[in-house]
Curated annotation (Swiss-Prot):
This enzyme's EC code(s): 2.7.7.6
Protein's recorded name: DNA-directed RNA polymerase subunit beta''
Cross-referenced InterPro entries: DNA-dir_RpoC2_beta_pp, RNA_pol_beta''_euk, RNA_pol_Rpb1_3_sf, RNA_pol_Rpb1_4, RNA_pol_Rpb1_5, Rpb1_funnel_sf
Name of the gene this protein is made from: rpoC2
Stated role: DNA-dependent RNA polymerase catalyzes the transcription of DNA into RNA using the four ribonucleoside triphosphates as substrates.
GO cellular component: chloroplast; DNA-directed RNA polymerase complex; mitochondrion
Binding site for Zn(2+): C220, C289, C296, C299
Molecular function via GO: DNA binding; DNA-directed RNA polymerase activity; zinc ion binding
Cofactor needs: Zn(2+)
Originating organism: Oenothera parviflora (Small-flowered evening primrose)
Family the UniProt entry places it in: Belongs to the RNA polymerase beta' chain family. RpoC2 subfamily.
Phylogenetic classification of the source organism: Eukaryota, Viridiplantae, Streptophyta, Embryophyta, Tracheophyta
Single GO BP term: DNA-templated transcription
Gene3D superfamilies: 1.10.132.30, 1.10.150.390, 1.10.1790.20, RNA polymerase Rpb1, domain 3 (1.10.274.100)
Length: 1383
């Protein structure tokens, strides 16, 4: 120091970092000897001063931060609000956990930042402050736990415990906090001893991989380098990357060279690079060295110990292994010190600079609605968004970066310092993330229900795991279940009404609840809001049209179950249960028109003699127009046409045409209705043959006599088939209308009677100015069977008239005697319909008539769905008979009397008018094949609660859909709780007939024509979104077990024109807690609307669980879940805990190449593209070489960045060249393909990349291999030395294989020489090796070996490869391949 270097005199307090910089400068100026002398003086000075000051720690020195109280209180308030939102179903468990953690972490972090200023202001010479902030002992985290708060803890798996420790160690911990603290600190894998051994094993494996890497040359002569751009990385990392390296190319500024190739880079040169902002710099690294099993001085660069180029013979491999392994060993101790305390990062916030109105460009391309990771609604910016805040006197412009959440609306007023945006927590805040599964467990017992508008496709076809496509709620509908143990009998029978209290008494005999595969669901039919049905009919309607218009065709289930005699329904007094065929068995069948259709009234109440179902027998079906006749004219009887009266949604049977004869006749004819303008090509009363053109685009299907009638706006063209007979003068025919001659009435042996054995229809035809003649038309005879064989339709015990409820069968002919029947566009015409009438004996003692209540039970046993229709007799107040046909009373529900007819399982007979809370539950038995152990589900009334009354609710459950201008369909919306009871009245409007294949006959059908009977039966079904679907009769009905609604393929005509009047509350609707449906009405609890009445609703309590896309739902729809069952699993990202505990396994994962995402997807794609193009340019031999090299180089860069990221996130600085040496070894092998090179290497043999290149050049043939990434363990077992491998692992296997192959160990590494006791080839022992290599170099070589075409291509390949690599590193904006940047 006396030599006098002009040093600047500084007078300021310095910390540990400043001392490090000072020592570095001292070494540069004075060298090692002088620096060590200076440091000795500093050390002596420090000890002397510390002794004189006599610093000691006492409990009084721990000063608590004054602002802690209100900070903790504020955090608690936020947690409470969050808990409430979670309970309401607004945020799901992961969002709640994430926000809770961030709230407490932000509080803890704020306290930590307050700590240093607090000490400075109150007591700058506090011993705790001096020690920790000088770096002498302890760190900020430990002091924070002493005087701030311990904060959030990690559990042994590294998961966060969301209950924070609010106390600090100065105040002392409560019992709960102490247990959480212990749980986080020393348990399981977090334990220090375990981690230390892991770190030691990692060091051993690392050294094993690189122990033979020694500096053995000065220059390998490589021309390649790796580019580093100062513009692409932070300055600090740029300096760390360059210092100590050697340049691979000359560096020019303009035409002036400022640094030459092979020059090492010091601090001065780096500063010049930064100052001039020059182009990317190409440097030499261990990756570019051409040596196979060692390294040269220039590719390694400066030695980190003394700052000069590394000496020959230095064992750089072992230094690299130790440098990476040692921080792991050291840092495991940190776990114990911080005690598993969570450290992470929170998102950065953008705050408003002043009060004012915020404005931005609300464009869907720029922003779209989203949920933040805390579940709050926000706008997600897809690119940079310019935001303006207009205050009174100034405009503030802010730019919100892409992928950020905007938390305010456009034109909203914001206050100063209000958070307006949340910047995505990227690399700057959360250093380290991982994907974690979080299971959510049910905290109550009940049935599982999914939102009806979400279809959950199973992940696997037969599993019970479903993925969620969009955000929706999962509901657990409350309801108890129990399973009897071993008892073959039960106190209750199936479907009994029961009291909930009896269940509690019985539960003593029941075992604990257990899961069961059989599930049951129950559907209720309930009344809707009252609404008068508008009468949209025009005055021109005839009586017949009114009948068609009001005929309800509520097609609920297509067919009655015929097979499965083991599922016979139980029958008891006052009850009838009918099995309905499940649609799973019918999935592949087309819908048969002959199926039994069950009709249910709107409110589920049957009156006496109500129609339960009807059956269309296919034998009585025809596709042609014609006339029906009941025997001869005098023999038929027409009962008065009352039809089916729609009375409060109940179909009472009143006969239309009922036959008294056992057979009837059908006279077919062909009818064409043509528009007025059409040109007819046949004359009236002319005879034509089959397939004759009768109009421009119309041909006849049958031959016969043509009758043409002109009507007002159309032409009716009839074709009568048959034979013409000209009567003699003796035959007097005095009738013009036709007469029916049934079979067997004429002369028995005459020719005519044999010819017309089915009977004939005789019709007299009188053409103008011509002789009249008689037309004999063929007749089809239909015999009516004596009743239908019900045994094949219903279980036999239902048809017997026992007890007091029975089914009666009535056949009737749909059309009147002599009435013409017209076909409409290829639909078949049903001539006879069979009605099943529900009847029971009138109880003479009771003053009120009984009604029957219908409901569906769906039982799911062993994967099969069985539907049962249950009908119960109940007492109901009788209505005045005079009001029955009153048109004003034809609404859905018009007065309060109907409320009490709405029987459901929560109303028992004697307590009908009381609140459901005091009423009974229903017990239902699951159909179990194991008869000894039936499973029960109890739905008690205590799970329901009643809200009401509503005074100002004005709404009607009517959904309107307009198909054309005048056509209005009225649909009675009485969807059951699970969305199943779809009941729709088919409609006719004034001008429009809609047939099965949507042919509109508007032009040809007028009001006069409508007096004839057309059979148009149209069914409409409504899905859960309120759209109305028209089912195609040829489509398959699929019962979707996910939402139990009938689905049909929609027709486009109806989709566009639907309009819905939304209702306030509808049956089956789910209501979240605190919702309010009336203006001053009560706040509801969360649940499902079960009953809606004029003044009240009944809601079944349910617990909502919010689930976001990508979540996995466990279990099936309608499955019974027990307390503690898994409902849903979320997949989410979370930040890692702050200890090396989590960092070390991650390093190991990367080094052992276990991680799936060790090479990013972009990189894989880029490699594939490169391989394709290169192969196309150069052909296969060189294409393989360059493709493999490029893959290896890119994966090396990616691996180095990954490992550095882990260590830097832990605050550990490791020089890149150490990691590069390790990565070079694990990426230096290639796998020989099975085709090619079979005469040199074995297929699938692992060989070094450089060896494969050289062999290919020597043999002058194509090389087939691919890059292969080995972990450090496998690399240690695939070296050139079998002695080294055997001393590492699997000694016997390695030695046996080496003996069989006859392997030779050349003893090039350190370990094998140590094992056999030789001199290791490093340091002084290195000189013998160098001497040998000089002799080796004196062997004469063939100078012309590389001449000719191969040499040219090879050099071309080298230049191309270098330019491609450098280009690739700089021209990829989405992921620049900077070598040493922690992205």
């Amino acid at each position: 120091m006396d030599e006098g270097v002009n040093l600047v005199f500084h007078k300021k307090v310095i910390d540990g970092t400043a001392i490090k910089r000072l020592i570095s400068r001292l070494i540069d100026h004075f060298g090692m000897a002088h620096t060590s002398h200076i440091l000795d003086q500093v050390k002596t000075l420090g000890f002397q001063q510390a002794t004189a000051t006599s610093i000691s720690l006492g409990i009084d020195d721990l000063l608590t931060i004054p602002s802690k109280g209100w900070l903790v209180q504020d955090a608690e308030q936020q947690s409470l609000s969050l808990e409430k939102h979670h309970h309401y179903g607004n945020v799901h468990a992961v969002e709640k956990l994430r926000q809770s953690i961030e709230v407490w972490y932000a509080t803890s972090e704020y306290l930590r930042q307050e700590m240093n200023p607090n000490f400075r202001m109150t007591d700058p010479f506090n011993p705790v402050h001096i020690m920790s902030f000088s770096g002498a002992r302890g760190n900020a985290s430990q002091v924070h736990q002493l005087v701030g708060m311990r904060g959030l803890m990690s559990d042994p798996q590294g998961q966060m415990i969301d209950l924070p420790i609010q106390s600090n160690l100065r105040e002392g911990l409560s019992l709960t906090e102490y247990i959480i603290s212990c749980y986080g600190a020393r348990k399981g894998v977090v334990d220090t001893a375990v981690r230390t051994s892991d770190a030691g094993y990692l060091t051993r494996r690392l050294v094993e991989v690189v122990q033979h890497i020694v500096v053995r040359r000065t220059d390998c002569g490589t021309l390649r380098g790796i580019s580093v751009s100062p513009r692409r990385m932070p300055e600090r990392i740029f300096i760390q990357t360059l210092i100590g390296r050697v340049l691979a190319d000359d560096i020019y500024i303009g035409s002036r060279c400022i640094a030459i190739r092979n020059q090492d880079i010091g601090i001065g040169l780096v500063n010049r690079f930064i100052t001039f902002r020059i182009q990317p710099i190409s440097i030499r690294t261990p990756f570019t060295c051409r040596s196979t099993s060692w390294i040269c001085r220039l590719c390694y660069g400066r030695s980190p110990t003394h700052g000069d180029l590394v000496e020959l013979g230095e064992a750089v491999g072992i230094i690299a292994g130790q440098s990476i392994g040692e921080p792991g060993t050291q840092l495991t101790l940190r776990t114990f010190h911080t005690g598993g305390v969570f450290t992470g990062g929170t998102a950065e916030h953008v705050r408003a600079p002043s009060n004012g109105k915020i404005k931005f460009n609300f464009n869907e391309a720029l922003v779209h609605p989203a949920r933040t990771r805390h579940g709050h609604p926000a706008l997600l910016c897809s690119m940079d968004l310019d935001v303006t805040i207009e205050s009174e006197d100034i405009l503030h412009n802010l730019t919100i970066p892409p992928k950020s959440f905007l938390l305010v609306q456009n034109n909203q007023y914001v206050e100063s310092e209000q958070v307006i945006a949340e910047i995505c927590a990227g690399t700057s805040t959360f250093h380290f993330k991982e994907r974690v599964r979080k299971h959510i467990y049910s905290d109550s017992e009940g049935e599982m229900h999914w939102s009806t508008d979400v279809y959950h496709a199973p992940e696997f076809t037969y599993s019970n795991v479903h993925l969620l496509p969009k955000t929706s709620h999962l509901w657990i509908l409350s309801g108890g279940s129990c399973r009897s143990r071993g008892a073959p009998f039960s106190l209750h029978k199936d479907q009994d009404q029961m009291n909930p209290r009896s269940t509690e008494r019985e539960r003593r005999y029941l075992s604990s609840l257990s899961a069961n595969n059989d599930q049951i669901r129950y559907k209720f039919f309930s009344s809707s809001f009252s609404g008068k049905k508008k009468d949209d009919r025009s005055p021109g309607y005839s009586e017949m049209n009114r009948i068609i218009c009001t005929l309800p065709c509520n097609l609920i289930y297509p067919s009655i179950l015929r097979e499965n005699s083991d599922l016979l329904a139980k029958r008891r007094r006052n009850r009838l249960v009918i099995p309905v065929q499940s649609s799973q068995e019918r999935e592949k069948e087309l819908i048969p028109h002959s199926g039994i259709s069950i009709e249910l009234p709107i409110n589920g109440i049957f009156r006496k003699k109500s129609i339960l179902a009807f059956f269309d027998d296919p034998r009585y079906r025809t596709k042609s127009s014609g006339i029906t006749q009941y025997e001869t004219m005098g023999m038929h009887s027409i009962v008065k046409k009352e039809g089916l009266v729609d009375y409060r949604g109940i179909n009472e049977f009143k006969p239309k045409y009922q036959m008294t004869i056992d057979r009837f006749f059908f006279i077919p004819e062909e009818v064409h209705i043509l528009p007025e303008s059409s040109s007819i090509m046949v004359r009236n009363n002319s005879l034509i043959g089959v397939d004759t053109r009768i109009a421009l685009n119309t041909r006849s299907r049958a031959g016969g006599l043509v009758r043409v009638e002109r009507k007002k706006r159309g032409i009716a063209l009839q074709i009568f088939s048959g034979t013409i007979h000209f009567p003699g003068e003796t035959d007097k025919i005095s009738w013009d209308s036709g007469i029916l001659i049934p079979p067997g009435t004429g002369k028995r042996n005459s020719k005519e009677s044999k010819k017309w054995k089915n009977g004939i229809y005789v019709q007299r035809i009188t053409p103008t100015k011509k002789k009249h003649f008689v037309l004999f038309r063929p007749v089809v005879t239909y015999e009516i069977a004596d009743g239908l064989n019900l045994a094949r339709l219903f279980p036999p015990d239902l048809c017997q008239e026992k007890d007091n409820m029975q089914l009666q069968i009535v056949n009737y002919i749909v059309y009147g005697n002599g009435k013409p029947i017209r076909e409409i566009s290829d639909t078949s015409i049903q001539l006879v319909r069979t009605w099943f009438i529900l009847n029971w004996d009138q109880d003479k003692k009771s003053a009120s008539a009984e009604a029957a209540h219908a409901s569906f039970v769906e039982v799911r046993a062993k994967g099969l769905i069985r539907d049962f229709l249950r009908i119960d007799l109940v007492k109901s107040p009788i209505l005045d008979p005079r009001k029955r046909n009153d048109p004003s009373g034809s609404g859905l529900i018009s007065d309060n009397v109907s409320d009490h007819t709405n029987i459901n399982p929560f109303y028992s007979k004697p307590k009908m008018k009381q609140s459901p809370r005091q009423n009974h539950g229903t017990i239902r038995t699951l159909l179990n094949q194991n008869k000894e152990c039936p499973s029960l589900m109890i739905l008690s009334a205590s799970n329901c609660f009643r809200m009401g009354p509503f005074n100002d609710v004005k709404s009607q459950n009517v959904i309107k859909e307009s198909i054309k201008k005048d056509a209005i369909i009225q649909i009675r919306n009485s969807i059951g709780p699970l969305g199943t009871a779809l009941q729709v009245v088919n409609f006719d409007s004034f001008y429009y007939f809609i047939t099965h294949n949507q042919v509109l006959l508007t032009k040809y059908l007028q009001v006069e024509n409508l007096k004839q009977t057309f059979q148009v039966l149209q069914y409409y079904l409504m899905d859960e979104s309120g759209r109305i679907y028209n089912p195609d009769p040829r489509s398959n009905i699929v019962l979707n077990s996910f939402n139990l609604s009938w689905y049909f393929l929609p027709h486009n005509n109806y989709e566009n024109s639907c309009e819905e009047i939304s209702t306030i509350v509808s049956l089956g609707q789910f209501i979240c807690e605190n919702g309010c449906i009336a203006k001053n009405g009560p706040y509801l609890r969360s649940g499902q609307v079960l009953i809606v009445q004029l003044d009240s609703v009944v809601i079944r309590s349910a617990k909502p669980y919010l689930a976001t896309p990508g979540a996995t739902v466990h279990g099936h729809y309608g499955e019974i879940l027990y307390d503690g069952d898994t409902v849903v699993t979320f997949l989410y990202e979370k930040s890692r805990s702050g200890d090396i505990t989590q960092g070390l396994p991650k390093v190991e994962q990367v080094l052992e190449v276990r991680s799936v995402d060790s090479i990013s997807v972009n990189l894989e794609k880029r490699v594939e593209n490169w391989n394709e193009h290169i192969t196309r340019i150069l052909g296969f031999p060189w294409g393989f070489l360059i493709g493999a090299e490029l893959t290896i180089v890119q994966s090396r860069i990616s691996l180095v960045n990954k490992i550095q990221k882990v260590y830097r996130s832990q605050g550990v600085q490791i020089h890149n060249r150490h990691i590069e040496i390790i990565v070079r070894q694990i990426t230096s092998k290639v796998l020989v393909s099975e085709d090619g090179m079979s005469n040199v290497f074995l297929p699938r043999e692992l060989i070094g990349l450089l060896r494969a290149e050289r062999t290919g050049r020597a043999l002058e043939e194509s090389i087939c291999y691919k890059a292969f990434l080995l972990g450090i363990t496998r690399t240690s077992l695939n070296t050139q030395s079998f002695i080294s491998e055997a001393s590492f692992q699997e000694t016997a296997r390695v030695l046996a294989k080496a003996a069989l192959r006859g392997r030779i160990d050349w003893l090039k590494g350190l370990k094998e020489n140590v094992v056999i006791g030789g001199m290791i080839p490093v340091g002084t022992g290195f000189k013998g090796l160098v001497h040998c290599s000089k002799q080796h170099k004196s062997i004469p070589k063939n100078k012309h070996f590389f001449e000719g075409e191969i040499r040219d291509i090879l050099f071309h390949h080298r230049e191309l490869f270098d330019s491609c690599i450098s280009k690739n590193f700089h021209d990829t904006p989405e992921q620049s391949f900077r070598v040493f940047n922690d992205s």
